[in-house]
Design a protein with these regions (language model features):
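ATP-binding pocket architecture of kinase catalytic cores
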Residues: 21-136, 150, 174
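An alpha-helical support segment within catalytic cores of ATP-dependent transferases
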Residues: 1-2, 113, 117-120, 124-125, ...
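Acidic, serine/threonine- and proline-rich low-complexity regulatory regions
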Residues: 244-255
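ATP-binding glycine-rich phosphate-binding loop
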Residues: 3-24
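A short beta-turn/loop motif at secondary-structure boundaries
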Residues: 11-15, 65-68, 257-258
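Active-site acidic catalytic loop and adjacent metal/ATP-binding pocket
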Residues: 17-24, 32, 108-109, 167-214, ...
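Active-site activation/catalytic loop segments of kinase-like enzymes and analogous catalytic loops
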Residues: 139-149, 210-244, 259-276, 288-295
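ATP/Mg2+ or Mg2+-diphosphate-binding catalytic cores
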Residues: 267-321
């Protein structure tokens, strides 16, 4: 619990409505998370998911104290060594860190429970990551990015056509198996702590397609990797899960979800800039386009989407930051 003499130092946050402070006066290292908006998700659900992860031998932040009325929780501090920051310092450890992250993903995807209690003792049932939600997320591309670049006289038709393509891709998803999906399983949310890889920022977790988190990691918009490396990490995941997955199904779902995720990301980053004045994410949009182009070129089933995007978004537009 926070005391009046506690010293708090604000630390860099993320794209959410939360703010983070490092508590320096405690014997234990801790982070205080404040969330006056979306309190239930950012405090109660975050704790419920972390509890589930910890129960299943996944390194996630422990809860130290909470004051829901005052909009905060105090959690374990994993330090500053995210996989992203470690990769920036030394790219030679790239393969090791990515493989350890895939190992962690394997543990998460073996979790069978879909319920967990939060610090108020209430059971939280993790929702399904269904096609409605996937559609609404990909549609952020249309609602925020497209309206910025597609000419007004063409926008209505473009919206109809792109929504049709998103729905078409969703009908092609094949995997019936459902696993715990973190939804932001990328280098910035994976932390090296106590010589292990742990995970943070898990409040948005849902039950869904195993290829989603794999696409989040391999096609991470924040850290560029070449096609050879991406294929190597993909094959490593396949080797670890060969008894659990159908090769063709996994690859098809992976490509589809990577495309839809990066469309979502372009939409979200545009919204952050336009609505919330957080323009620092715009610089990542050109690489999100590169990732879409990489996956879209792999299969004829994406040909209509490819043509539609090429017709409306020139290279000049795609490279704008």
């Amino acid at each position: 619990m926070l005391q009046t003499n506690d010293k708090l130092k604000k630390i860099k946050g993320d794209a959410s409505f939360r703010s983070f402070y490092r508590k320096s006066s405690s014997k234990k290292k801790s982070i205080v998370v404040f969330a006056s908006k979306e309190k239930e998700k950012n405090l109660l659900i975050y704790d419920a998911i972390n509890s589930l992860l910890i129960k299943n031998k996944v390194l996630a932040p422990k809860l130290y104290s909470e004051n829901y009325k005052k909009n905060y929780i105090e959690i374990e501090d994993f330090g500053d060594d995210s996989v992203f920051s470690l990769l920036k310092k030394n790219k030679n450890q790239k393969e090791t860190l990515y493989k350890k992250s895939i190992d962690l993903l394997g543990v998460i995807q073996k979790i069978k429970q879909n319920r967990s209690k939060n610090f108020k003792g209430k059971t939280y049932k993790i929702p399904i990551y269904d096609n409605v939600k996937l559609f609404n997320e990909a549609n952020l591309f249309c609602e925020w990015y497209a309206k910025k670049f597609v000419k007004k006289n063409k926008l209505t038709k473009f919206k109809i056509d792109i929504k049709k393509q998103i729905r078409f891709l969703l009908t092609l998803l094949q995997s019936k198996e459902k696993v715990l999906v973190h939804r932001d399983f990328h280098a910035s949310n994976l932390m090296k702590y106590k010589n292990k890889i742990g995970v943070i920022d898990s409040q948005d977790a849902l039950i869904g397609n195993r290829a989603y988190d794999l696409a989040s990691l391999i096609d991470d918009v924040r850290f560029k990797t070449d096609k050879i490396f991406k294929n190597k990490i993909y094959r490593y995941y396949l080797k670890l899960n060969k008894k659990r997955v159908n090769k063709a199904t996994l690859l098809s779902d992976f490509e589809i979800l990577s495309i839809l995720r990066n469309m979502k990301i372009i939409g979200i980053f545009t919204r952050l800039a336009m609505r919330d004045k957080k323009k620092q994410y715009l610089k990542l949009i050109p690489y999100a386009w590169k990732l879409i182009e990489l996956r879209i070129s792999n299969n004829k089933k994406f040909s209509e989407l490819k043509s539609l995007l090429e017709l409306n978004f020139s290279k000049k537009i795609r490279n704008q930051k």
